[in-house]
């Protein structure tokens, strides 16, 4: 069996400059949801592109064929554009690219139903409480297929039908090639409707699915949000079945490609996106955002943001920390409140607990970074590196003016501005000497009174 995915539409009701199928559901473009599902079952897949074709093509895997529909003149015209892909000796599955919820199991059931029916085509239908916008399935008194009528062409009686066409079909390839030239665009929209081919087919099977949620088509941002909610629920349920605790699924947002180990706990208002992997026995949240990051085992991240970071095991982050791209935290590191780290590697058992900025830094093992420490990494033209070797103690309110190195075991006194390298096991003090003027306040007040 072959498959054509229709992805040429502009999606006017999305009110977007981007092709409809490029919009994401749980971090994955709609077109990739449908293709990843289909390619698990079939290896011959063609995608029909049109509006914003280049953007759509960038999202397609290499093992699919691409056909360009130069004018968007309806679903029938889209299939005509791909007629060279249709094999008369093979069946053809047709799907829309804006159906990100359809599952592999449902597609397999549709295929099985068609194979058992010995019919020219199979139409997939569902019942909807509100069928507005969908073509209606018209049956005869015995329940057999009569026709599909598009809503714009339907009578009031036909509009009252709640069994709708999902836009998913299987055709006998030879039959479809025979009847495609018979359809025309003599209708209110001036389009070639693929549904018109059924008037020329004698044997049509109907597969009525009980899972209407899988066939939600995305035509506007409201439906996009509805699809996101369904898919998010399925993602969270799968994680919970695999041993992850989701404290409040209603306020937890996890993308499709995220991996989380068992016995980890995800607290409310956590947003975990992109290519993120979280190990076992972790505590994430509440109010935490993680993007494209690796997190080892037994890591705690509270009220913080991580993007493009690598965090090894037994690390504590937060609250109110920000880990930016290029951050690496090795085993046992502790990052506390209001700490920002960018493009820096922090070695084992080092602590930066309060009010710190580390940018473009290499920090060794068992280092203590005092509150208020900053690396002055930008000189106005380029970023410079700060190196802090093992067992260094950096006192509070220290400014490290890069490029600079603090060698092993050195101490930097609180309040210092360090702009020269500090030798190993040395004490660096770079601040003005304190001066005390006894009774200065009393003398000042006396002068003011005179």
Curated annotation (Swiss-Prot):
Annotated region (Pyrophosphorylase), positions in chain: 1-221
Cleaved signal peptide residues: none
PROSITE patterns: HEXAPEP_TRANSFERASES (PS00101)
UniProt keyword annotations, A-Z: Acyltransferase, Cell shape, Cell wall biogenesis/degradation, Cytoplasm, Magnesium, Metal-binding, Multifunctional enzyme, Nucleotidyltransferase, Peptidoglycan synthesis, Repeat, Transferase
Cofactors that this protein relies on: Mg(2+)
Keyword hit for Ion transport: no
Region annotation (N-acetyltransferase) ranges: 243-450
Subcellular location: Cytoplasm
Region (Linker): 222-242
Enzyme Commission number: 2.7.7.23, 2.3.1.157
Binding note for cofactor: Binds 1 Mg(2+) ion per subunit.
Annotated Mg(2+) binding sites: 98, 219
Reactions that this protein is recorded to catalyse: alpha-D-glucosamine 1-phosphate + acetyl-CoA = N-acetyl-alpha-D-glucosamine 1-phosphate + CoA + H(+); N-acetyl-alpha-D-glucosamine 1-phosphate + UTP + H(+) = UDP-N-acetyl-alpha-D-glucosamine + diphosphate
Assigned GO CC terms: cytoplasm; membrane
Positions annotated to bind UDP-N-acetyl-alpha-D-glucosamine: 6-9, 20, 69, 74-75, 96-98, 135, 150, 165, 219, 324, 342, 357, 368
Any one of the GO BP annotations: peptidoglycan biosynthetic process
Molecular function, one GO term: glucosamine-1-phosphate N-acetyltransferase activity
Binding annotation for acetyl-CoA: 371, 396, 414, 431
Active site annotation, chain numbering: 354
Pathway given in the UniProt record: Nucleotide-sugar biosynthesis; UDP-N-acetyl-alpha-D-glucosamine biosynthesis; N-acetyl-alpha-D-glucosamine 1-phosphate from alpha-D-glucosamine 6-phosphate (route II): step 2/2; Nucleotide-sugar biosynthesis; UDP-N-acetyl-alpha-D-glucosamine biosynthesis; UDP-N-acetyl-alpha-D-glucosamine from N-acetyl-alpha-D-glucosamine 1-phosphate: step 1/1; Bacterial outer membrane biogenesis; LPS lipid A biosynthesis
Family of this protein: In the N-terminal section; belongs to the N-acetylglucosamine-1-phosphate uridyltransferase family. In the C-terminal section; belongs to the transferase hexapeptide repeat family.
Complexes and interactors: Homotrimer.
Functional summary from the UniProt entry: Catalyzes the last two sequential reactions in the de novo biosynthetic pathway for UDP-N-acetylglucosamine (UDP-GlcNAc). The C-terminal domain catalyzes the transfer of acetyl group from acetyl coenzyme A to glucosamine-1-phosphate (GlcN-1-P) to produce N-acetylglucosamine-1-phosphate (GlcNAc-1-P), which is converted into UDP-GlcNAc by the transfer of uridine 5-monophosphate (from uridine 5-triphosphate), a reaction catalyzed by the N-terminal domain.
Identification of the protein by name: Bifunctional protein GlmU
Organism: Pseudothermotoga lettingae (strain ATCC BAA-301 / DSM 14385 / NBRC 107922 / TMO)
Gene from which this protein is expressed: glmU
